[in-house]
């Protein structure tokens, strides 16, 4: 999938932009806070129907403006044009359209334009709680497996309903409680199976890329942990119902799953340096790119690289440059404050490129 051009109106600090894009590499240069990340977020929004950074849509509308609008035209693998549009006025719901036809459910759009974003906020994958790492799995799997989206939605609904019953002052209806527990178990076991299959395939890709970037200096591992590994999920959920009732929420289920990040045999969070942590998440995201390429009908995802070279030594920067400069990747968007990094990439790359300069929300060639 190739993003040919994009129109942006009132998206964060970008008041207006109409850009023709390179099918290979697009570089955005500018100081911090100028709008480079906001531009990448606009592209992300057209893939996922939401911002990568703001959960409340009204917060992405430019201050004192009544609406925002995004529109992108893509070349798909069949040589056809895909038009994707999103617009929202303050105080109303957003409208998301594909080829002028509005979606009934936004989840129907997920996976049409596969995309991987690598950004400084990815450090939360290591330093944050398990919900960050579950989200990582959810975002990737949802892009190629619609049944996963449905199971995740059904599981979260059942979890919410069970928790509401657990919070009641009077004894909850046991029939209702068991109904939601069964829904959690059936959908949860499906989520577990798909997450485990994803991790099994991701691990060797991730380890190979990490070794390429680090120069074989460290050994890294991923370890998926789930309550489903303790036995049938329904039994696990019901076993501690008394404790759940005491605390007022569900202590067991796939909403507590985790993906452990290890440097050698020790947690990355405790052992990794800033450079090792950044190498870890970059390798993880690039491995997800390769995984998605194999699973999304062999479609090359868009690759968004936001300020990825900060806190990396020269050897690791050079290794990443060589990686992303290869034919393995399709259309790439890279932001940096340092023109030298981008010049090195362009020297190593064959094919078309475009350089944009970003200042106070204005994007210029």
Predicted region positions:
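Conserved NTPase motor "head" modules and their coupling/switch loops across ABC/AAA+ ATPases, GTPases
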Residues: 1-31, 175-186, 190-302, 311, ...
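Conserved lysine of the Walker
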Residues: 36
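Post-Walker A helix-loop "phosphate-sensing" segment adjacent to the P-loop in P-loop NTPases
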Residues: 44-56, 287-295
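Nucleotide-state sensing region of NTPase/ATPase domains
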Residues: 48-126, 130-132, 138-144, 148, ...
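Structural recognition of the conserved hydrophobic beta-strand(s) that form the central parallel beta-sheet
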Residues: 72, 331-338
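An accessory alpha-helical subdomain
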Residues: 124-214, 225
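Walker B catalytic acidic pair
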Residues: 306-308
């Amino acid at each position: 999938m190739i993003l040919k051009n994009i129109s942006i109106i009132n998206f964060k600090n970008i008041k207006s932009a109409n850009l023709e894009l390179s099918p290979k590499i697009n570089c955005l240069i500018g100081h911090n806070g100028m709008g480079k990340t906001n531009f990448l977020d606009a592209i992300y929004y057209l893939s996922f129907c939401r911002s990568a950074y703001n959960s409340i849509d009204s917060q992405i509308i430019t201050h004192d403006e009544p609406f925002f609008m995004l529109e992108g035209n893509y070349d798909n693998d069949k040589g056809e044009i895909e038009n994707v549009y999103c617009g929202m006025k303050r105080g109303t719901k957003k409208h998301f359209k594909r080829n002028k036809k509005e979606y009934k459910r936004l989840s129907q759009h997920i996976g049409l334009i596969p995309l991987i974003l690598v950004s400084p906020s990815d450090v939360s994958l290591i330093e944050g709680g398990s919900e960050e790492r579950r989200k990582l799995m959810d975002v990737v799997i949802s892009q190629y497996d619609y049944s996963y989206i449905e199971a995740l939605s059904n599981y979260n609904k059942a979890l919410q309903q069970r928790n509401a019953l657990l919070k009641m002052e009077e004894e909850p209806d046991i029939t209702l409680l068991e109904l939601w527990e069964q829904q959690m178990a059936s959908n949860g076991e499906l989520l577990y199976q798909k997450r485990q299959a994803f991790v099994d395939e991701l691990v060797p890709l991730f380890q190979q890329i990490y070794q390429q970037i680090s120069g074989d200096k460290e050994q890294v591992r991923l370890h998926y942990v789930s309550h489903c590994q303790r036995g049938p999920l329904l039994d696990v959920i019901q076993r501690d119902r008394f404790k759940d009732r005491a605390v007022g929420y569900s202590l067991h289920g796939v909403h507590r799953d985790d993906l452990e990040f290890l440097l050698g045999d020790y947690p990355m969070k405790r052992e990794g340096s800033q450079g090792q942590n950044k190498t870890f998440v970059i390798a993880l995201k690039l491995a997800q790119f390769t995984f998605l390429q194999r699973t999304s009908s062999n479609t090359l995802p868009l690759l968004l690289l936001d300020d990825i070279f900060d806190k990396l030594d020269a050897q690791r920067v050079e290794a990443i440059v060589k990686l992303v400069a290869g034919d393995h990747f399709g259309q790439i968007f890279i932001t940096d404050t340092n023109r030298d990094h981008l010049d090195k990439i362009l020297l190593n790359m064959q094919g078309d490129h475009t350089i944009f300069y970003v200042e106070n929300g204005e994007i210029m060639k």
